Design a protein with these regions (language model features):
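Central antiparallel beta-sheet cores of small beta-barrel/beta-sandwich binding domains
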Residues: 1-70, 75, 110-113
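Edge beta-strand at a domain terminus
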Residues: 55-56, 82-113
Length: 113
């Protein structure tokens, strides 16, 4: 499955992501999330052929948490179903010597008019 995400902040900075969920026996991890980041000029933030990969650390019928560990830095991205029409996505980052980061993105299904 593929998807995209755009985050525009009040200070004018923004981020665009293309995401791919991989759930096949041939994948590096049985269930993983690959992300390619772009800036507002649509330039890749990772190296040309690189992407960020996170593996599933927790998986239930209503929640999945992906994790990446790299030289002391830990990044976790989670998605949790909060009701029939609500989803909470979140991002956590911990790096030695830096303040921890936690950002939440609540989503509610839009109703057709």
């Amino acid at each position: 499955m593929i998807g995209s995400f755009r985050w525009q902040r009040a200070n004018g900075r923004w981020l665009l992501e293309f995401m791919q969920l991989i759930d096949t026996p041939a994948a590096t991890s049985p269930f993983s999330l690959r992300i390619k980041h772009f800036n507002q000029d649509f330039r890749g933030m990772e190296e040309k052929d690189a992407s960020t990969s996170l593996v599933a650390a927790e998986r239930t019928p209503t929640r999945v948490v992906f994790e990446m560990k790299d030289a002391g830095r830990v990044v976790r991205v989670g998605y949790e179903k909060k009701g029939p029409d609500a989803l909470l996505a979140w991002f956590d980052e911990q790096e030695p010597g830096k303040p921890a980061v936690h950002i939440e993105f609540p989503y509610t299904r839009a109703t057709a008019r």
